[in-house]
Regions:
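Amide-forming acyltransferase catalytic core, primarily the GNAT-like/NAT-type
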Residues: 1-58
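Active-site/acyl-donor-binding loops of N-acyltransferases
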Residues: 43, 47-66, 70-141
Length: 141
């Protein structure tokens, strides 16, 4: 996985198919599941653990994000659980989709720190709105 710069000056990890296969599908300890939507145009990778459904990755076009989220919630049916996901408040469309679907801002809260080794990177590091992250970017989930 490598850093990827997006057109709107945000940064994320380039998560290729082989990266996702190694990270989730072939994981030696944890079981992860994939929920696809619209002929695999949108997919959610999640883990079920202790009554929590943790959305570790959510890849979707902006027009499919809300309907896919609703479809995912409906697919859980009668399963009694708490669904957790990380979403930056700076990702306004995704954040509002989560809120409209009944998600409430709560824990776990993503926190990180940085030490700038190269002054050329200080603008990037000091701007949290330039980062795209998911629960899968942490070793916790």
């Amino acid at each position: 996985a490598i850093r990827q710069k997006h057109s709107n000056d945000t940064f994320s990890i380039n998560k290729s198919f082989s990266y996702l296969q190694d990270r989730y599908i072939d994981h030696p300890v944890n079981n992860y599941y994939v929920h696809c939507y619209q002929d695999k145009s949108s997919f959610i990778i999640f883990r079920i653990h202790s009554g929590y459904v943790n959305i570790v990755e959510f890849f979707s076009r902006s027009d499919l994000f809300s309907p896919h989220l609703e479809d995912f919630i409906e697919s859980l049916g009668e399963y009694s659980c708490v669904i957790q996901s990380w979403c930056s408040i700076f990702e306004k469309n995704k954040y509002s989709s989560f809120l409209r679907s009944g998600f409430l801002p709560n824990e776990p809260i993503f926190q990180c720190g940085a030490y700038v080794l190269d002054e050329r990177a200080s603008d990037i590091i000091s701007s949290p709105n330039k980062f795209v992250f998911s629960m899968g970017d942490s070793d916790v989930f």
